[in-house]
Every structure is written in structure tokens, then in C-alpha cells.
Amino acid sequence: MAGQGRGAARRAGVCSAVALLALAGCGAPPPDSASREIQSMLDRRARALLARDEAAYAVGLDTSLAPAALKEFDHLAEVPLGSWDYRVKDVDRTGRDRATVRAELGYRVSGYDSGPVTTERVLDLIERDGRWYVTADRPGADAAQQLWQQGDVEAVRGARSLVLGVGQPEERLRAIAAAADRAVPAVSAAWPSPWAGRVVVLVPASLDAMGGLLGAPGASYRGIAAVTTGEVRGGPDAPADRVIVNPEAYGVLGAFGQQIVLTHETTHVATRAATSPATPVWLSEGFADWAAYRGTGRTAAQAAPELRRAVRAGDLPAALPDDKAFAFGGDADALARAYEGAWLACELIAERWGEEKLTEFYRAVGAHPSREGAVEKALHEVLGTTPEDFTAAWRAHLGARLG
């Protein structure tokens, strides 16, 4: 869900002659000079944070911001950061000694991220005696909160996982790490293609806090036990995805349900490099559910109760669910039927054509340059069938498994 951009630090925009004269008359330094000075200050701030040098970190803070900023510094103490840096993108001189800066913050969790996670920050600064100080630091217009801005982060390391939580008991974080550790080999068995083989899980304190991490109202995710964020079609330098747990919905599940959730989300992490805008949601979500239920012994009636009710009531779906059917915040029963139908489509492929063909089909769809024709081409080339015949086979499969 995240899209990142990288670029050299440059001042964007065009200033009018009047504005330039006004700044010059006030004795303001040239914009490029201010950008360099601000970048240097932020570089020092980043080095101090990585070194856990609180005194050096505080040097660039205005007294009005210092208490809040030093709290965030403390909140990050347990996070195993491998890198942390800022790139100044734009400096807006709002007065003789004032500036507002748009900067890209990039950070990497050591041992998990091959590339930095990036997010935009907006910083207000004041200049005193030739030095710049940060007076405010907030997310950019389209940026979400970061976990450490919500409280002290507790880190629990599993054998194949890192769980970062705020406001959660340690035993709960350890249980999530154990489930994530079990998920990784299960996913590797279902998805034999190379992937990182590890997962980062974020556990915020509440549903609303989860919404803050996703830049959306928490109510949008009510009833959703977890989601995964990351770059679609991330390259080898893309950061690891983040699995974000909804502590309320996840907490009401039993051990089996919790394991299914984490295996499902870990599957998204594993398949990310093969997932692209050409991949329909039914395939990405259906495959993740197929991988999660694989080998558990659960029947279709147990795993697809909403769709079973519909089929038994004579409401057999006419077509595979479209992307809109998977939108959060709508009819919960309809959403469940979409997931269940997608899972059974992938189960059909695995049973009729084989598991290797299912993963080959997934990769073939994701490799297509666009959504148009992606599924049709993969159905023909990998499975030797047509959309019409596959849909008919899927509907028959639903009737046989759920009727």
C-alpha cells in the first residue's frame, strides 16, 4: 500500500522576483545554501539517532519540540534500525528566520529490509545564530503515522520473525512471533519460489491506532484481523512488507484462526515480487487463503461458511469476484463470500492442474504488462483453458464442494 519515491534533494517551485527581493532585503541566505544547511542538520540528527546519542539528537531541536521529539527517540530504543536518513525535497522560506521543509525519511530494519521504507515528513524550522532548529515534525499530506509515534515500541524476535508492538503484553507479542515463525515454512512449502523467508509484524494498541498506521479511519478495518503493506512488484532492494495486526479482531480468534491469518498475510509477503497491477485481487487473496488452509484438513464447508449458505440457497455466483468485491467497510458477508470464492478458485487449480501449475499461473499473470488480457493469456498458456471454461469449472466446483 505504499508507494515510495526517491530523488536528489532539490528546491521545487519558482519564486517571484518580489519574493526574492523581499528575502534578500531581510538578509536571508540563498535558498540552496539554506537547503544544504538544513540537510546537514538532519544528517547529524539521523546519525545521533542511530548511535542512540540523545544529547546529540537534541542539539537540532527547538525547546518547544524537544520533549515530544525525545519521547519518540525513546520509543525507538528497541527497534533494530540498520539505517535512518532524511532527504530534503523542498524548502519553503516562510520568513527571515523560518522555513517549512518537505523531507523524505528512509529507514531500514536491520536483518529484514533490503531497502529503506520511505515516508514523507514536513518539518517547521527556525534559524538562530546561523543554525537551524526543528520546531515541528509531522507526516506529509499522504503519509501515515509510524508505529513509534504511538508509544514505546517493544520488539520480540522470533526465529523467522520480528514483532514490534505498542501497548501490548509481551506474552501476546511472543505468541504472535511464534505463529509468524510457523507461517514462514508453511508459506515456503506452498510458494517454492525464492523469497526473504522472514516477516515483520506490527501490533498497534488498538483499531484506531491500526488506522493511523494505514492512513485511514480505523473503522475501515473493523473485523479485519490483519493486513499487509508493501510495494507491488518490489525489486530486490524493496523493503520488507509489514504485516499489521488489528489487535481487536485478531484477539477474538482462536489459535487456529490466528494461524490462518498470519500464514495468509505472510503469503502476501512471499508473493509480492510476483504480484503486479496485472494481478486481480481474487488471485492474490485466493492464493493467500489457499496457502493458509493448505494441509490443515479443513473442509470447504468449514472454511467457506458464507458462500456455502449462498450456494445452498440457490445463489451460485455467476463470475469470479471482481476487485471491488474485496473492498473493506462494506457488507461483511459479501466480503467473506468474495474471499471464499477466490480461495476455491485457487483450490480448483491446485486440484485439477496441480500445485506447480497454480504457482506458475500466479507468476504468469503477474508478469503480464497490464491487467487487460493477463488472466486470459495465463489460462491459455499455463492451464490450457479459457475464461469461460474456467468459470464454468469453478461454478461446478463450488456446487460440488458446498452444495
Residues of each region from the PLM?
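Bacterial N-terminal signal peptides that target proteins for export
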Residues: 2-14
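C-terminal motif of bacterial Sec signal peptides marking the signal peptidase cleavage site
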Residues: 22-25
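Short solvent-exposed beta->alpha transition segments
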Residues: 30-33, 39-40, 51-96
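Surface-exposed, charged secondary-structure patches
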Residues: 73-118, 249-251
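Extracytoplasmic
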Residues: 81, 96-98, 118-120, 129, ...
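Short beta-strand edge/turn micro-motifs at domain boundaries
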Residues: 111-152
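Juxtacatalytic substrate-recognition/specificity segment
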Residues: 157-280, 371-374
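Acidic/His/Gly-enriched intrinsically disordered linker/tail segments
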Residues: 229-236, 256-257, 275-403
